[in-house]
């Protein structure tokens, strides 16, 4: 039996402007969410916040908007990948924000954090996630709108 694949662009998240992509792709209970930069969806052309704490919060808030639009919950996250432009300077502060979004020590996703030399819009951080939901898998052929 072939699975249905759904592509999502959430109006509440920053619009894809630098490339063509879906905010998320869903198949068989899995949701792969495209990396999010710290862009304010209400003011997408505004300068990015300067500090890592504000940037990390914006990334996670954007991820939550996309996840919610696809009818998943952040608690369904099984994997997080983080790109930090200044690993040594930003790792600890980023982790404090991360801990606020993933606060149940019994349900922590797997995670990779990578130091990179540059990110789009000169952001300090970008985050992408993968989620899985048994309930969504059971209804995988029913599209969301």
Give a label for each model feature:
Residues 1-61, 65-78, 84-145:
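N-terminal presequence-like segments and the immediate start of the first folded domain
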């Amino acid at each position: 039996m072939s699975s249905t694949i759904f592509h999502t662009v959430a109006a509440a998240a920053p619009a894809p402007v630098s490339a063509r992509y879906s905010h998320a792709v869903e198949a068989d209970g899995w949701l792969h969410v495209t990396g999010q930069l710290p862009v304010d969806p209400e003011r997408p052309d505004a300068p990015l916040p300067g500090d890592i704490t504000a940037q990390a919060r914006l990334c996670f808030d954007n991820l939550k908007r996309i996840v919610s639009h696809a009818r998943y919950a952040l608690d369904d996250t099984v994997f997080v990948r983080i790109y930090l432009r200044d690993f040594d300077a930003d790792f600890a502060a980023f982790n404090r924000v991360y801990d606020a979004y993933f606060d149940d020590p019994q349900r922590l996703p797997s995670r990779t954090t990578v130091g990179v030399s540059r990110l789009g819009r000169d952001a300090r951080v970008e985050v992408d996630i993968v989620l899985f939901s048994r309930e969504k898998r059971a209804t995988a052929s029913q599209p969301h709108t």
